[in-house]
């Protein structure tokens, strides 16, 4: 078995997008802890390949990869939790959809991070 890929559809809860963007930009700024958070999430078996915002008020679509053995329930718990993309703000409603790579003869959306 190999790692798994997911498309995650994020919608902002009413009135939360500005605070979320402010928090995200602060985290990504030098010294904001972004690199450390990415490394910690990767160590736990979660890796975000891309984040794709449609507008500042959403939606945002992301491609995530999880290491082998992480269930969809565990992934959803991570995505909804304080170390996921919501920064613990309860700003996002997250719909996680697994990508069935077997339908595309094993083609993955990105090269695997977890082998």
Where are the predicted features?
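Short S/T/G/P-rich N-terminal loop/turn motif that feeds into the first structured element of a domain
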Residues: 1-59, 65-77, 96-115
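A common structural junction motif
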Residues: 79-90
């Amino acid at each position: 078995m190999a790692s798994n890929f997911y498309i995650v559809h994020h919608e902002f809860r009413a009135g939360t997008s500005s605070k979320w963007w402010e928090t995200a930009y602060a985290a990504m700024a030098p010294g904001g802890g972004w690199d450390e958070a990415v490394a910690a999430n990767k160590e736990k078996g979660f890796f975000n390949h891309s984040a794709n915002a449609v507008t500042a008020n959403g939606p945002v679509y992301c491609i995530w990869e999880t290491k082998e053995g992480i269930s969809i329930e565990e992934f959803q718990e991570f995505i909804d939790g304080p170390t996921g993309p919501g920064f613990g703000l309860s700003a996002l409603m997250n719909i996680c959809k697994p990508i069935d790579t077997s339908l595309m003869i094993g083609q993955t959306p990105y090269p695997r991070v977890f082998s």
